[in-house]
Amino acid sequence: MSSRNWTGPQEAAIGCREKNLLVAAGAGSGKTAVLVERVIRRISDPAAPVDVDRLLVVTFTNAAAAEMRKRVAEALERELEKHPGMPLLEHQLRLLPQADITTIHSFCAELLRRYHYLIDLDPEFRVADETEAAILRQETLEEFFEEQYRVITGDPDLEFLVEAYGGERDDLKLQNLVSGLHRFARSNPWPEAWLARAAAFGADPQGLDGDGPLAWGLRDLVGTGLEAAVFELRAALEAAKAPGGPAVYADALAAEVEGTARLAGLVAGDWEPLRAAFLAFGFTPRLPAARAGVDQELKDLCSRCRKKAKERIQNLKETFFARRPEELLSEMAALGPAMRRLAALAADFGEAYRTAKLARNLVDFADLEHYCLQILLAPGSTPEAPVPSPVAAGLREYYVEVLVDEYQDINAVQETILRLVSRQDAAAPNLFMVGDVKQSIYRFRLAEPALFLEKYRAFDTGEDAGGARRIDLSHNFRSRESIIHAVNAVFRRIMTPAVGELAYDTAAELVCGGTPAQLEGSGPPVEVHLLGAPTSVGRDTAGTADDEPDRSDEADLTAVQREARLVAGIIRRLAGLGGECTVPYRDIVVLMRATTGKAGTYLEEFRRQNIPAYAKVGTGYFEAVEVETVLSLLKVIDNPHQDIPLAGVLRSPLVGLGAAELAAVRLADKEGDFFRAVVAAAGQGGRLGAVLAGFLERLEKWRSQARCGSLADLIWDVYRTTGYYDYVGGLPGGAGRQANLRALYDRARQYEATAFRGLFRFLRFIELLQEGGQDLGPAPALAESENVVRIMSIHQAKGLEFPVVILADMGRRFYMPDLNGEVLLHKDLGLGPYFVDPGARVSHPTAAWHVVRERLRREQLAEEMRILYVAMTRARERLILTGSAGRLEQAVLRWSHAAAGDGETLPVPVLAEAESFLDWVMPVLMAHPDGEPLRRLAVRSRPAAGTPKDRSRWEVHLHRPEDLEEAAGADPDTAAVLESLRRLAPIPADGGLDEAVHRALSWHYPWSALASCGAKISATEVKRRFAAAAAGEEEVPAVFPYRAPPARPAFLETARGLSPQAFGRAMHVVLQHLDLAGDLSVDGIRAQVAGLEEREFLTATEARAIDAEKLAGLFAGGLGRRLAGALWVRREWPFCLVVPAHEIYPGLEGHPEERVMVQGIIDCLFAEPDGLVLVDYKTDRVGPGGEAALADRYRGQLDLYARAVEAVLRRRVKERYLFLVMTGSAQIIQ
């Protein structure tokens, strides 16, 4: 037994017997040590020892199981050293290798092999790895749908599903929906019953006045929205009453607060009175005019809060109360047959997939659990009354205790298995569960924290508890006191039952463990570094100033680079700037919510500042040139009649043809595919023919090898015979390139270790990885074990601890892809579908969809809150938080508003509408004494109140992007280098040396003009350049990228409520989707716009902004009539055009060989018998006589568009027009 000093709760958790025991262990509380000590004491108790093989210890991972077995063995060996020859200890050591210290899946697999005969399963089954399972699942899914389509005639529900949810061009959306529904159902112990119940969600016979899940969910959704509206209106009222505020608004706002609160009071009653009240409710049409001299910022704040409340209530009214409740319910009833058919498809696919696996003697991880349930459940068991089988009863008697680690991460199937093998419900309970629900972060793996929470709330905490007891381990032995106080300060205010699913009360908060290291000086304050954006970039990337939407993501990438630079500066400060290292790099970890797409940027910035760093980059492998080249060759070996892979191989170093030689190959056979042209060119002799003939000979050998031999051997033979492996080794980064090729070889070997064979299937598997966004990441240049800064995701850091944690990218928006499907899935509610009428081309969310979406959103928010908790509790010595906040002043105003409540926790609307970690943490700091730098930016700064319990200390730093750019402009070691140079003796004068130095310093790079010009340019940028040239403006070098002017502030918005950029985007949507064969009168266009709004192509605000009269005038004119009668029309037509670089970049006339690719989208192109007509939509405001100036401004752009059209379609563009939306006219470009 351990000699360490256990706390009282730890001792109770170790020694409590004959109860179901839930140990709620906070971060750093030593839960693993408690679990190991409990096992050791049970097996080494002299009075009542338990054989170690009669304990079932379930861990989350194989590594955790191995570590626990190792710890138990070491403890027994230590005891044996103290008591040599003690029979009990020797006996337990002999039993330990057979002990059930295992993962849940390993336990299930062992049970299946032992009792396979009960379910007619081959005991020699093999567990499929993820690669094998993914291929087989996809193949089975495709074959399953092919079989369904053979009998689709006479199955109207299946036809409806294909039409409504199948996608525009194929049925992949429906296939993925069925596959996802099957996988989701398998997380339930009774998947068939769950599918039947899920399909019936929304079909509540009590309607919206009952207490069914749909009615309850709608009331909760409406009530939450009204609560948020009341909060916004009260904030507006407070701003109106503030000194200098628009006091004249106060009476109207007070009445609106009261009226909204009355609406909220009706939510618990019947639906029809609530609906009537909603329809009758209205805001004051126009607030009184504010007196002169009123504080403009307070007035704007008041208007902004009131506007948000109005929009919120209007959205609720339009979504739920514009139609009668019978209409809402009738939509669900109409979808009932289709949802039941969808559930049946998922069940039938599951059976087809199970059959395919059994044919190969395979099982997946879900099979392990469900087959195990078949063995453990007696025949006749139901979800309401599960009965243990004789096998389960025997295991209950055999296991003296069942101990479960990381209990917060199990799912419902695993819970049922544990319930069946333990005596959880018996007279002598024996289930021990340990975990921390605040660290349950595996929802994406269908973990179910509600199972932990159910027991957390139900179990008693006293020593005299009956058969179930809860013990809280709150002492943290990991972090310094300053970090513990900071974690408590944040989560006391943000983790609530309404949003975080748990109250962060005295039972949940952390207590300093009191070790000397923790208490020494209590540690430095927690640092917070906030980074604002340049004025042209806001919280949402601003569009261009023009009427065309900006499709560039440059601003987002720049934000990542800026924050990476900020973090690099922090690391350099920690490590010591003068060469004396105060914190080793290996002690520093940078944590992010997700590293995909960002870790590479951080690595590059760290490398630039000479900071060694390591990250498992999950992207970039398949884009590596060497990997693309070999994969192209494998595609050609599989099927040489693929033009693009074949051309890529011929152009690559594997063959080495140039562009002119490829053109010559194409000319050898102009009619056939490219492979036929290669064969023809190979027979024409000459050097080119000889090269191609040699390639074809090798290709035929490889194709023969692919049919008969090993795939891995084929790949290595390609490396060896072509010398390509050695070739890439000689390129820059050669070691990494060779590592990438070895990884491809290893992947092929792993693939061949499965039940699959063949090159085609391997390539299909690679395609599945790429389509699913799964990448291997390039081979890293540094190892994780070296003295490097580690960059990892928060999930990768779970269970680990680090001396210094930098939690970066806290401004990242929460990513919630589960909320965007046409059919949403929820474990308790079931299916939430869109209502779709394919014939009428109508599609919109049902009430059930809204309810399911809101529940999923709340659960995902709770998950994000737990992820933040995990991140902040990884630090031992120092915790540093960084984030980009867009326009910092606006963000601080938002946080100031959020922090305005006086309660111990932040208001529920604030917590529920957070979009990032910053939206939770910063309002807490706004009310803290150390948050003064934030409050100075706010309109109204409340005194820092804090809370009586709050002993946290913070250090807040606000950074301007300009500071980072200036710091990045110089080498970090420049100052030291210059100082060293100053100390050197002067060099003796030498005329020849002077001349050489002069020549060297006077040299100019001959291609500097090219270096500042991009190889690809957007049509929007070309348009800007042409417009600048037309206006006689001086061109800005391309090295300084164009930045859009800042978005208009809210108080300058037009009456329509849209900025010019947003209006331009909305008009483009309308002109793209208008039915030109339909009614283009004023009423007809209004009807079509209403249809676009209903299908959610437009928001209500955008739809109201569309001027149907001007559009009708356009289409009634000559050009509009020609457009309606055209031979064909193409809208939003993308193009790429290669042009001489000097046509775009003045000053490059001396480089006629250089080319630039122009990429753009043509608004409209239509054909008439004698040629093509090109039309570009413009929403610019035009003054009297301004049409000609506008034509001059855009002439260069439309010339370029016309060249692109003529190059691609080989037809003449006879006319070019500007469609001037604001004047309702068309302007021809001469």
UniProtKB/Swiss-Prot annotation:
Source domain of life: Bacteria
EC code: 3.1.-.-, 5.6.2.4
GO annotation (BP), single: double-strand break repair via homologous recombination
GO cellular component: cytosol; DNA helicase complex
Cofactor: Mg(2+)
Catalytic reactions on record: Couples ATP hydrolysis with the unwinding of duplex DNA by translocating in the 3'-5' direction; ATP + H2O = ADP + phosphate + H(+)
Gene3D superfamilies, per the entry: 3.90.320.10, P-loop containing nucleotide triphosphate hydrolases, PCRA, domain 4
Record key words, sorted: ATP-binding, DNA damage, DNA repair, DNA-binding, Exonuclease, Helicase, Hydrolase, Isomerase, Nuclease, Nucleotide-binding
Keyword tRNA processing listed: no
Compositional bias ranges of the Acidic residues kind: 545-554
Location of region: Disordered: 535-554
CDD domains: DEXQc_UvrD (cd17932)
Function statement: The heterodimer acts as both an ATP-dependent DNA helicase and an ATP-dependent, dual-direction single-stranded exonuclease. Recognizes the chi site generating a DNA molecule suitable for the initiation of homologous recombination. The AddA nuclease domain is required for chi fragment generation; this subunit has the helicase and 3' -> 5' nuclease activities.
Quaternary structure annotation from Swiss-Prot or TrEMBL: Heterodimer of AddA and AddB/RexB.
Name this polypeptide is given: ATP-dependent helicase/nuclease subunit A
Source organism (scientific name): Desulforudis audaxviator (strain MP104C)
